[in-house]
């Protein structure tokens, strides 16, 4: 009996040892496998599909594979090795992207340019397996994905992202974007974020936290079918660049920017350029004390009938060229408070303002202006330009071309349209001394 117990005990011991060895082998194997896992992208043999993996099976994949950090050059700019470029020889036909379930265990810190110039891309599957919790850079992520019509980004964790520059730029077929879950509290760059998103008719950005954003240039540029934008919750206190922000938003009929804090903005070049449907703009709260560039700011705002710029501080502006170009329906402009002492360029400033009948520029200081080319050209209804007695004008061609109704000291002569006629003694200006000059 004792012998039998001894045998049973021995067998139990052997089983325990065997089980322990099996567990050790499995653990070793799993550990080894875990240690060799890598994030990579595999291209299908027909070059139409990219699949993102995080496993130890890269060597078994057919077709080309790239490590997740591999790059190539687009000119001098590094882009992911699998991304497409403008080089025709490098052009591929990626129509589909798949995130394998294994990829959910990977934590990228950047997704910048991941789908750069994938012009044929129509479908992205498994985005729920892309964990973006540690991503800081999403710039150019979907840049020029012009065949994409929709994107499901509800699982995107963007709490650590600082750069969204050009994230959706040139996604010309995107008809809608649900960004309600986007946490943008740390984003500093939103420049060109929706640039050239021609098909977007609406954008709900009420949840956007823009408190740290410094760059909004071209943010909505060429969003040609946007009919409205609610930006009342935008905090723009740190923004320095708003150039071309609403460039060619041709169907926007109104913009409520009363809450915009522009105290740190230095560049408003082309800010409302070609907003052809805007009928009014309330900019009374705009602080422009640090702005240096207003080139083309209201160019082609063809439906604007009036602009209240009394509160504009232009003391640091150097460029006012094209500022009101082709504002066809503007009937008046009160620029009495404009400080132009640092302006060097006024070319085409009022060109094409065919409804303006008079301009009072007696407070304009033009001592540093070097270019007045076509400054008043084709202001067909303009009859009077008031100036001060110190107006100075460099040689500038076609300054008064097409101003057929203009009369100052002399009546308009189509053969005399250059800078020599920019005076109140023998030209088309009417002298109206400033208070300082009349004392």
List each language-model region with its residue ranges.
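Intrinsic-disorder-associated, low-complexity terminal segments enriched in Asp/Asn/His/Tyr and depleted
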Residues: 10-13, 244
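Negatively charged
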Residues: 33-439
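N-terminal secretory signal peptides that target proteins for export/translocation
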Residues: 1-10
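Bacterial N-terminal signal peptides
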Residues: 14-28
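Conserved short loop/turn motifs at secondary-structure junctions
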Residues: 9, 22, 29-33, 387-389
């Amino acid at each position: 009996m004792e012998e039998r117990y001894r045998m049973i005990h021995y067998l139990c011991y052997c089983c325990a040892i065997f089980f322990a060895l099996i567990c050790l082998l499995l653990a070793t194997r799993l550990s080894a496998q875990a240690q060799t896992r890598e994030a990579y992208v595999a291209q299908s043999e027909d070059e139409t599909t990219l699949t993102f993996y995080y496993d130890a099976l890269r060597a078994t994949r057919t077709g080309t594979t790239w490590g997740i950090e591999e790059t190539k050059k687009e000119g001098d700019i590094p882009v992911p090795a699998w991304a497409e470029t403008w080089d025709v020889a490098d052009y591929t036909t990626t129509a589909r992207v798949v995130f394998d379930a294994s990829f959910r265990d990977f934590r990228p810190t950047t997704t910048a340019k991941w789908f750069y110039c994938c012009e044929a891309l129509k479908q992205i599957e498994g985005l729920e397996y892309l964990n973006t919790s540690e991503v800081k850079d999403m710039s150019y992520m979907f840049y020029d994905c012009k065949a994409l019509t929709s994107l499901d980004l509800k699982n995107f964790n963007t709490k650590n992202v600082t750069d969204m520059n050009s994230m959706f730029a040139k996604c010309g077929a995107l008809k809608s974007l649900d960004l309600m879950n986007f946490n943008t509290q740390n984003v500093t760059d939103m420049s060109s974020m929706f640039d050239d998103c021609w098909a977007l008719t609406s954008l709900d950005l009420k949840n956007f936290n823009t408190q740290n954003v410094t760059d909004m240039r071209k943010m909505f540029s060429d969003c040609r079918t946007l009919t409205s934008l609610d930006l009342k919750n935008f905090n723009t206190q740190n923004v320095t660049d708003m150039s071309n922000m609403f460039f060619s938003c041709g169907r926007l009929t109104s913009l409520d920017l009363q809450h915009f804090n522009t105290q740190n903005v230095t560049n408003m070049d082309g800010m409302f350029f070609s907003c052809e449907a805007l009928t009014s703009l309330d900019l009374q709260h705009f602080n422009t004390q640090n702005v240096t560039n207003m080139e083309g700011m209201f160019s082609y705002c063809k439906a604007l009938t009036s602009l209240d710029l009394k509160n504009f501080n232009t003391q640091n502006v150097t460029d006012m060229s094209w500022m009101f170009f082709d504002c066809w329906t503007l009937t008046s402009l009160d620029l009495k408070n404009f400080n132009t002492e640092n302006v060097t360029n006024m070319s085409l400033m009022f060109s094409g303002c065919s409804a303006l009948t008079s301009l009072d520029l007696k407070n304009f200081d033009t001592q540093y202006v070097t270019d007045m080319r076509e400054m008043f050209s084709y202001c067909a209804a303009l009859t009077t330009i008031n100036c001060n007695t110190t107006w100075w004008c460099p040689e500038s061609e076609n300054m008064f071309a097409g101003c057929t109704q203009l009369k100052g000291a002399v009546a308009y002569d189509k053969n005399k349209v250059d800078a020599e006629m920019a005076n109140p003694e023998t030209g088309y200006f009417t002298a109206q001394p400033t208070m300082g000059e009349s004392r």
